[in-house]
Amino acid sequence: NQLEIVGTHKRIPDGILYINGLPLVVFEFKSAIRENATIHDAYKQLTIRYRRDIPELFKYNAFCIISDGVNNKSGSFFADYEFYYAWRAESDRQLFQLGEEVDGINSLHSMIKGMFDQANLLNIIRNFIYLPDTTNKEVKIVCRYPQYYAATKLFENIKEHQKPQGDGKGGTYFGATGCGKSFTMLFLTRLLMKSAHFASPTIVLITDRTDLDDQLSGQFTNAKGYIGDNTVASVTSREDLRDKLKGRNSGGVFLTTIHKFNEDTELLTDRTNVICISDEAHRSQVNLDQKISVTEDGVKKSFGFAKHLHDSLPNATFVGFTGTPIDATMDVFGEIIDAYTMTESVKDNITVRIVY
């Protein structure tokens, strides 16, 4: 009753999930009652012994599962052990909302019901595994559960609120600092670009700091194949953005900073399949109201950068990512569609506590 895989040596993986005859997920289990067998041993079995002895099996591999019956983690075949993570929530993330602990055998149940739900699994394999266009080492990024649920929920909310039928408020995502929001944006961009509903939209990614812009630019320009669009570019000025959008009816991913939008910014496009994704959406990207200042020369009226952005893209749908949600964020981008708190992030070993 055992499936033997023969390469340079014969190996017997504990479990293989086949889809249409392709071995897409490989499982390795260790006993929870054997003190000398750990989940890390399962990782080494996969990435050292199997990689050496039966590499052909992993030509089709999407991701791997390691488990000792208590700890259960998923990750890329190429990932270091610390980048294997538990899948702690089912499709509606109800477990965390109810405050139930998702450890031990519960984490196995949540992985099976969440990650291995048929629709979720096919969606993950199709849209949530990112391989960079170029890299000097073996890299494959598999989504974690907060990234998967956030991207899919935002995608559906954008469809619901897209202009002209909707109000253009695509929703707010509240994610703890350091939780991988840039990859969530990348996964969301892939969903939008591959959707027939949006008819090859134009995506504008907006930050409020040049270092954030540089970080996102490096990531997105190396993901053209994954996104499915060869036009992924940083915008150097308002005029550059105007030139890039002029005459464009579809497609393109453009990265810019909010400060490029001021009172001189003209209408860039009135298309409805333009999606603006704002990073750090609690800062300078929510100032839509008029400001009045009194100077020696009299009363001066002005608007913030966000007002000029919205005026230049009047029919776009706006999505906000933030680690610090405030009322103004939700006024501009809409209600919080999903959240990943610092408590969850610490529990998942994504961020660490600062104790003083």
Residue positions per predicted region:
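Conserved motor-coupling elements within RecA-like helicase/translocase cores
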Residues: 236-254, 267-271
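Signature of the SF2 helicase/ATPase Hel1-core->accessory helical subdomain module
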Residues: 39, 263, 269-356
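A short beta-strand-to-loop transition that corresponds to the Sensor-1 phosphate-sensing loop
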Residues: 69-70, 209, 256-260, 280, ...
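Short acidic, S/G/P-rich loop/turn micro-motifs used as interaction or catalytic elements
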Residues: 32-34, 260-262, 284
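ATP-dependent helicase/translocase motor core
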Residues: 1-202, 207, 211-227, 249, ...
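Conserved AMP-binding/adenylation subdomain of ANL enzymes
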Residues: 226-232, 349
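Conserved helicase motor
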Residues: 210, 232-242, 257-263
